[in-house]
């Protein structure tokens, strides 16, 4: 094998299908590996291009392949899907990945470092706490509303009102439900503490990070957006040819419809990119 040879890997938790494509697009290898056997096999191969669909654990396998001396390419699942023929099987998926890696218009996804993955995970954990708190807030309001108890808008208004609602014996709230509401109230308070702790740690990490601090100098970019831009653009966008490519990566360019030499620019496309980051920006 050589760097012109493509090793396409269809990832899963325990079973991995590999398709090796030669320079003249002939399938040299088409077999399934276990996790341990794939590592051993990759280590024995000569330096090649390892193409992987960007899914769960893709960054781990890309970095491992690079340690073994290979060149790696992470490809968007949407791009790979164009080249899938026949039924969706591990074999066909691996072949589609191999074919996609050979296309002239393929736009590889940058492999994230361990530091970037850790920052991304911490932000997802914080977002999970926030989502859980919103869900708990809405659940409490809907339960109380069924018994004719309304609370002013805002999450803080609800939390302040809960103790008084539980102590009011004349509001028609069944005794069997008061204990459940109290537990939900305590759960909300625990989530609020977790959010504050997580946000504080995240802010410290961002302030100590030189690239994030650089991004915060941009107008309208705070801690959360600086982290989002760093994770989306990598090394402050050094891998992009120009600012337009970077803007397209995060979904801030208008959708284009061209035909017959006429170009029509539409609204901001919502087809790609990080929806959370795009909405924040």
Tell where the protein language model's regions lie, with residue ranges.
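Nucleic-acid-processing active sites and adjacent nucleic-acid-binding tracks
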Residues: 24-48
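Short alpha-helix plus adjacent loop in nuclease-associated cores
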Residues: 73-110, 114-121, 162, 260-272
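Glycine-rich, often acidic, oxyanion-interacting loops/wings at catalytic, nucleic-acid
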Residues: 124-214
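Phosphate-backbone recognition surface of nucleic-acid-processing proteins
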Residues: 214-217, 223, 227-281
């Amino acid at each position: 094998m050589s760097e012109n040879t493509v090793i396409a890997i269809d990832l899963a938790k325990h079973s991995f299908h590999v398709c090796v494509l030669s320079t003249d697009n002939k399938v040299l290898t088409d077999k399934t590996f276990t996790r341990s056997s794939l590592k051993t096999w990759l280590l024995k191969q000569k330096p090649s291009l390892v193409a992987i669909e960007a899914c769960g654990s893709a960054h781990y396998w890309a970095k491992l392949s690079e340690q073994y001396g290979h060149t790696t390419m992470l490809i968007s699942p949407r791009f790979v899907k164009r080249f899938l023929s026949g039924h969706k099987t591990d074999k066909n998926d691996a072949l589609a990945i191999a074919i996609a890696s050979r296309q002239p218009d393929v736009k590889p996804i940058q492999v994230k470092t361990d530091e970037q993955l850790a920052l991304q995970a911490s932000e997802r954990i914080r977002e999970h706490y926030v989502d859980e708190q919103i869900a708990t807030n809405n659940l409490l309001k809907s339960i109380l509303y069924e018994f004719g108890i309304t609370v002013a808008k805002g999450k803080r208004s609800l939390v302040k009102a809960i103790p008084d609602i539980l102590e009011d014996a004349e509001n028609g709230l069944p005794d069997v439900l008061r204990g459940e509401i109290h537990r939900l109230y305590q759960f909300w308070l625990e989530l609020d503490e977790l959010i504050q702790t997580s946000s504080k740690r995240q802010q410290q990490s961002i302030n100590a990070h030189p690239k994030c601090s650089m991004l915060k100098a941009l107008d309208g970019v705070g801690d959360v957006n600086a982290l989002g831009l760093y994770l989306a653009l990598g090394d402050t966008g050094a891998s992009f040819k120009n600012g337009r490519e970077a803007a397209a990566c995060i979904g801030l360019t208008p959708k284009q419809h061209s035909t017959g030499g006429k170009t029509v620019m539409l609204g901001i496309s919502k087809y790609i990119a990080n929806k959370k980051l795009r909405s924040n920006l």
